[in-house]
Amino acid sequence: MRSTSYFFVFLALAAVFISPPISFSDDLNNEVYLLSKNNKLLAFSGLQNKWSEKDLGTGETVVKSDYDGNVAVAYTQDRALAFSGITGRWSEERFRIHETVESIKAQGNVGTIITNIRALAFSAKKGIWVESVFDIHD
């Protein structure tokens, strides 16, 4: 009986060392691709297995874009745009007067656009923008 117990302990320890590592958001597969072409933004969702397009206005051009994981973000002179590979939908947030973009980033399920007056965050899971306005009186 005693040797059987040792055998099961050995099997349990071997399973711990052989099992695959836990995957964190940094290891998230890229499921989205973003392309700017012919006055449109085109996003491909690997999860939905389809392309989705967003028309740009007359004279509107993409200044900068980024994509990673399940999210793609871009901005033009007029608005912030984001695509969720999970929902397969676009969302937009118009810029305010005298608002200038300082940074743009896509990582995992989150896209961010930081401006001189607020931080915009887009969740690929929810498919919506959330803002935090900076207190300019500090």
Show which residues each predicted segment covers.
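Structural motif
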Residues: N38-F44, D78-S84, R118-S123
